[in-house]
């Protein structure tokens, strides 16, 4: 959502391999912050083995398992918990898991043990790192797809969800999803040491999440999508007010004349750590998302905006994509806007440009 720090250039390359029953995906990145040396990094996105036994299929390793309906937000994405609306679409880093699935002509059942290695009593560093058991049941009934979900997390306990997607006409598709959680994980400023990140993932009370959406596709490959959702696991308005107050206090401290260099560096570090809670699936609890697109032969043009009614903040994106047999080129621009009191106006980066070239071989 928030993009790279100001003045930062990044290059990414994604490599995939498939050998017998083993699949792998590796992401190579090179990041060059303004005025600093380039940093290279390699990360295994997926590495898992598949097997079959009767009507069941099994996967073991690090794998992406994405559930639920919806584009801008997915309440029942209880395994992968993938970041949505990213500027560049790459394979996310899968979760360590053991997956068992069975398929019928119109049904499917999936059972997952995710993050089995995470058995600590303290809350995980991110919500997606929690050890949990999850299950999904899927049924297709004509033009309607039905989903039921259940999850038991080590820290968040029980959650139940349901989703439906219905192709109402040749041009119109409707979808909805809802989830109730006994507990949820959220960022809280719990630390006090000046040399440590004060933000910690903490267990909070019950939360509800839901999404309503519609997608229209025209005869000339033009499309319009509208989604409205509530994310009860996002920080509430009072929490963001405290976040802004802390931002202001740190900026005022950094501007004090005669502040020692050591203290100034400490304040700069605290300001950098203020970006920690910005990585959630939703910044505000209530959101409206609109996306328009048009495809003609090898070209696809798209525009979308995420609107947050709480403070009238907006995140808008325009993109153009050209695709041939082996190449896909993408140019995109994202802008964060809104009035001065909007959360998006306080974020460190307001504009992000992207050029991506993908070669399949």
Describe these PLM feature segments.
Residues 15-19, 50-53, 101-104, 137-141, ...:
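Residue-level signature of outer-membrane beta-barrel architecture
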Residues 5-13, 40-45, 92-96, 103, ...:
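Residues that define the transmembrane beta-barrel architecture of outer-membrane proteins
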